[in-house]
Amino acid sequence: MTLATAKGFATMLRQLPLTLLLCLSAAVSRAEDVGRFSNDWTGNGIVVEAVPDPKVSGVTCHLVHFDRGVIDRLTKGNWFENPSNSSISCQQTGPIVIGKIATGTKGEEVFSERMSLFFKSIAVRRIYDKTTDTLVYVAYSRQVKDASAKMSLSTIALFNANPTWSAGKP
């Protein structure tokens, strides 16, 4: 086997789990890849995605997470699983127009992405803090087995943002 053939085969193997996940996943991702780079010699990578809030225009969250490479998958198994570690940062990226959002303490999910074939995903939830007039975004791991406390937080204070509330301010 030539080096070019081996590299092509390795690329195909690396993309296979993602292709299968996309085929089996009923949820449609609204995130856009804005960055992707390798962080070690085994081909493991870091993925940066832009996630717009579907009910709050003018807000974009950037979510970063790990993507396992072929060598890592071969040596450790778990072909169809990525770690659920993530980090989030949300910013005002335009005039803020807030639609009908959940204002209870549970907030509402604005994004979810599978990190394995079954039961594991990264989710982003928005909570409105009425007291401080702040949008709170929490990125967290949803894992059935061995639930973990992997999460990160980002906030957008609405104090100087002069948002428009299309359904009226709560």
Q: Residue locations for each model-derived region?
A:
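Bacterial N-terminal signal peptides
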Residues: 17-25
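Low-complexity intrinsically disordered segments
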Residues: 98-170
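Sec/Tat signal peptide C-region and signal peptidase I cleavage site
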Residues: 27-31
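N-terminal secretory signal peptides
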Residues: 32-89
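A low-complexity, Ser/Thr/Gly/Pro-enriched, surface-exposed linker/loop concept
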Residues: 85-104
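Bacterial N-terminal signal peptides that target proteins for export
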Residues: 4-17
